[in-house]
């Protein structure tokens, strides 16, 4: 299988892990993984060399160089690695497909641009391809995003490019059925579809980095959120902080700290600013920049508890839920009650500190619910004893088995 993905360890982007987890497991099912990626010297994001330890030696990694970032009159035109590396990836893919025998080509998005080479490669070399959705390519803009701006341009471009990328795809996969339902309704495609969660490899979450110390204040109980902060999640973050403010007024909790890692988003009011506005700055520490994946795992292991705050949307798929269940002493969660993540919590009897979000619940009641759950969550005597056996069906090997069966069915049906 030829996997074309511009990010690969030591790149520290979120998208690395789904592709890595699948590639690592393919050999168990009789497949050889070749990953075609961009040389890390051309990656703008921070690098995490430790991540290379998590790549199976069975995975062949082929790297190409991307073109430099484009500027005009001192202004940055584009720097997206999927664009800068597109030609080099396509040319090397074409060469590999001519010289070797591959049975399938796989793209995982984002990056949004690499699947655009799928129709060309498939037609030219006769190899079927699939597109995997970790995030929706086309999505509904929030009221704050609407207007003549970059977000609207991005969505307009997505509406134009998505049909081109998937029109000849033999397989669509995704972390959520909701994502694929949207693709199908927009494009009226009849190709095979399969869903499987982000998944996890338990061993990833046990790696110790000896020279890293979590950013915890001495003498305080530390609770950690590590992940993104986006438009569809912003209302829930504010509600969480409002619930925390209410708790602080009734039951001072200055011996606690709530640390938010990787939540920088220039389009949104910062969590630091919201905490200041609510008068709870002493409780909230925001580290806007993402930190290396293995450092995050160490923070989660050593914290008094982990926090998962998600989207208002029902198709929300909490990839970070797995790492928190595997590593944390206890878990507070707040996201849509109809999401698959909620069902996973219930399966694992891990929902003691879960607050369900539903648009029918009033803001006042949500804040009260958060206050009550957080008060329970921070209680050292509160027992949280999840049953993790149900997670087995979501681990990386189980996911890869589901994926491989779908790929092999596609190949069989194509004859």
Where are these regions (language model features)?
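N-terminal subdomain of nucleotide-sugar transferases
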Residues: 1-60, 247, 408, 412-415
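A conserved catalytic-core segment of Leloir-type glycosyltransferases
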Residues: 35-97
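Membrane-proximal helix-turn-helix segments that form the acceptor-binding/catalytic region
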Residues: 87, 113-116, 120-124, 137-139, ...
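Carbohydrate-associated surface elements
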Residues: 178, 198-199
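Acidic anion/phosphate-binding donor-loop and adjacent secondary structure
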Residues: 184, 199-218
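Nucleotide-activated donor-binding/catalytic signature segment of Leloir-type glycosyltransferases, i.e.
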Residues: 262-263, 268-295
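A charged, aromatic-enriched C-terminal amphipathic alpha-helix characteristic of glycosyltransferases
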Residues: 357-368, 372-409
